[in-house]
Every structure is written in C-alpha cells, then in structure tokens.
Amino acid sequence: MSLPLPEGRKRRVWPWVVGGLTVLLTLGLLTGVSFGHYSVKRSFPQTSGVIELAGLSAPVDVLRDERGVPTLYADTMDDLLFAQGYVHAQDRFYEMDVRRHITAGRLSEMFGKDQVPTDSFLRTMGWRKVAEEELGLLDEKSLRILAAYSQGVNAYLQDRSPADISLEYSVIGLINPDYEIQPWGPADSVSWLKALAWDLRGNMSDEIYRTIMSAAVGVDRTETLYPPYPFDRNRPIVDGGNVVDGEFVQDPPGLQVTAAAYGPAAIPAAAMPALTDVLQASAGINDWLGEPAR
C-alpha cells in the first residue's frame, strides 16, 4: 500500500529530479561534443615537431605557410618524393583514395551498388588499364620517382586505422563495413593523369555560359561565379623557366623568332586581351607553345 507524498515533500523532490536530469543532459552533451571534436581532429596532419620515418636517407624539412600550404626541402630527389607522398597522404588521402577508385571504375567498392553505372562508364574509358600499360613504357628515372612517392604515401598509412587516416572512413564504415584501404602504387598516380586529361579536354560549355552571362550582367558580376585564379594570394613558386635537355632552367635562352614568322600570330595575339574577359581562365593549365619550325 502506497501513500501519496505530502504536498510540501513533492515541491522539494521535483527540483532534485529536474536538476539531476539537467546535469545528465549537460554531461551527455559535453561528452558528445568532446567525442565529435576528437573524431574530427584525430586525422588532422601533424604540422609541428619531428616525425621519425624509415625510408629517408637524410632529414627533410616541411614548412607550412599561414594557409597550411607545405613547402618541402630535401637533400635528394628520392627523399623529396617520399616526403611529398607522406605529406599528401597526411593532408588528403581520402581524396586520393576516391580518385583512384574513380580512375579504376571501382566506386561501388566504397559507396555501394548505386555506383555500378558510373563504374561501368569509367571502366569503358579504361583509364586504369592505360596507366598500367604506360608504366611499362616509362624510363628508370620516372619509375623511381613514382616508387619513392608511393613509399611515402604508404609510410603514412602504415599502422593507422581508417578513422586515424580520415574522418570520412568512419562514415564509410557505417555503410560498408567490409571496405579496406589498400596500399598506394605507381599506377594509382599515373591513372589520375588520365582523368586530368579528360577534365582538360575542353571547357566549351563553361565558355559559352560565361560569354552569355558577361553580355547579360557584365564581366565583374560574372566573375563572382567564375572567379579568376588568386595570384595575389597564391603566388607561383616558379614564375618562369623551361626544360632544356631534360633539366629545368630558370632563365632559358629565348627562341629566335623572325618578324615574318610572328606576323600571322599578330592578329589573334591582339585579340587575346578582349577574349580573356569572357573566357574562363582557371579551368587548368593545358597550353602548348611551339616554335614556327615545328
């Protein structure tokens, strides 16, 4: 047999109940926020201190500017490429992993059967197959560069859980618990060049849209949707130079071009300043310049 609590006792009990629930909810919220913060930051790159890595023949310095952009200094090309692979994996391995699945037509392995039609198209393009065939045609120096870079990427992946590599893998684990990260290889690097070539094959539709918009609302407003590259913020490391006899030269000798040879190019050259106002300037760098004799 239970008896009702006196009215005064009820008033004393409710504040304790409400206070207890408030404390529990607050603790739960703080725990959730702390766990979320930890889950996000656990895969962030280490940007200070010293990292001991097997595979380097000498120390490599990695300096980051105020925007986090790294600049690497090494004594040998092998060490430089090794460190570049490591730093790339630190900063963006998930993106790299998605891209190699794109070029191989294996997106469904990451994201499920909905990606099968996309994989079918990508395998028809054959980017991965072409990349693997090209590896057999590369010289020893190129293969060594690709191998050193791959070793650096894999040095970062070694002994790290998917969640330590990138937050996105925790999400993939919920929809595809069987997914496993594979080591990086030279073909993964070369195959993305095929995708870049596809992406840079032409930007006709963008140029049409930009031209129409420029005529309708003006160049300044159009550039809010198609902004030019911010050279004032991200200055090129090398502002000139050329490759001469297989080596980079900062100030190469100029081509001897006669006035007669230049004459036919004068008309389109004069029109270029007007065209650059309406044509997109930041789609990519895929330009070639040949001397008249070629």
List each model region and its residues.
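Juxtamembrane low-complexity tails/linkers enriched in Ser/Thr-Pro and polybasic
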Residues: 1-11, 271
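Acidic/proline-rich low-complexity IDRs
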Residues: 2-4, 20-24, 274, 288
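N-terminal Sec-pathway targeting helices
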Residues: 7-27
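Substrate-recognition/specificity elements adjacent to catalytic centers across diverse enzyme folds
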Residues: 30-294
